[in-house]
Regions:
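Short histidine/acidic/glycine/proline-rich micro-motifs that form metal-
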Residues: 4-10, 120-123, 151-155, 218-222
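Active-site loop signature of alpha/beta-hydrolase-fold enzymes
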Residues: 38, 121, 154, 181-182
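Short N-terminal signal/transit or membrane-insertion segments
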Residues: 1-11, 102-106, 145, 149
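Histidine-acidic metal/acid-base catalytic patches
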Residues: 54, 68-69, 127-149, 155-237
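Structural motif corresponding to the early beta-alpha repeats
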Residues: 2-94, 185, 211-212, 219-220
Length: 237
């Protein structure tokens, strides 16, 4: 399963113990965590509180490690968006410095990789494509900071599936959904009934050896949607 880093880091000790115990009893492994930072915890602009970031991230990494997580996803569009009239380039560089100087050390300490998630421009102006994420990852000089491909954000940003091949082995995680608005939701659990063609996305993930893919989307009927989604997920084998 993939949990929420922000939620795990913000839990009371009692709530975390309950989560840990429930997972242990179920036998389900928490392999990844997304939703890295709350929107108000900025890594760009003039009001970056590095002390608060450090404490929050350390607590989250420590807890995610206990849950068994191997990968943390850095989306957090509001946290890394352009702020305070800063130029886009400066906000991009601030984001890279944050990853290099604050996050990379925790990745090494807890043996957890971080995947930079390119987001569509409606959610952030900083890192919108796989290429931009690759450049950011390389600038951190960390062997544990890599890239994620999300089918919804790729379509929204016009990021061609072929660009997955250019990322190569640096692509360590992926998100899948039915990436078309259904009215109430902008993306939902994948389902063959929608007739969406995942073949190129799936084939390219396989070609680069992407080790993990998870569902990121909304559902109004979790149990039945999960069963239907399994038919799509099996194609990644």
């Amino acid at each position: 399963m993939e949990t929420g880093f922000n939620s795990v880091a913000s839990m009371s000790d009692g709530d975390f113990l309950s989560l840990y115990s429930a997972l242990a009893e179920s036998g389900i492994k928490c392999e990844a965590a997304n939703c890295f930072l709350p929107g108000e915890m900025s890594v760009t602009g003039k009001n970056v509180d590095y002390d608060a970031l450090y404490k929050f991230i350390e607590k989250g990494f420590e807890r995610c490690k206990k849950l068994g997580a191997e990968t943390v996803v850095f989306g957090s569009g509001r946290a890394r968006d352009v702020k305070d009239g800063y130029p886009l380039r400066e906000c991009y560089l601030q984001t890279v410095r944050f990853l290099k100087e604050t996050v990379a050390g925790f990745c090494d300490k807890y043996y957890i990789d971080l995947a930079i998630e390119p987001l569509c421009r409606q959610e952030t102006q900083v890192i919108n494509t796989l290429k931009e994420a690759c450049i950011a990852a390389s600038m951190t000089d960390s062997g544990r900071i890599h890239v994620l491909a999300d089918i919804y954000h790729m379509l929204e940003s016009g990021d061609d599936y072929a660009n997955i091949l250019a990322v190569g082995s640096d692509l360590i995680h992926a998100h899948i959904s039915y990436p078309v608005s259904t009215g109430r939701h902008k993306r939902v659990y994948p389902n063959e009934k929608y007739g969406f063609d995942y073949s190129e996305f799936i084939d390219n993930l396989k070609k680069v050896g992407c080790p993990r893919v998870s569902i990121e989307g909304s559902t109004d009927d979790f149990e039945n949607d999960l069963i239907s989604s399994y038919e799509v997920m099996k194609k990644f084998r």
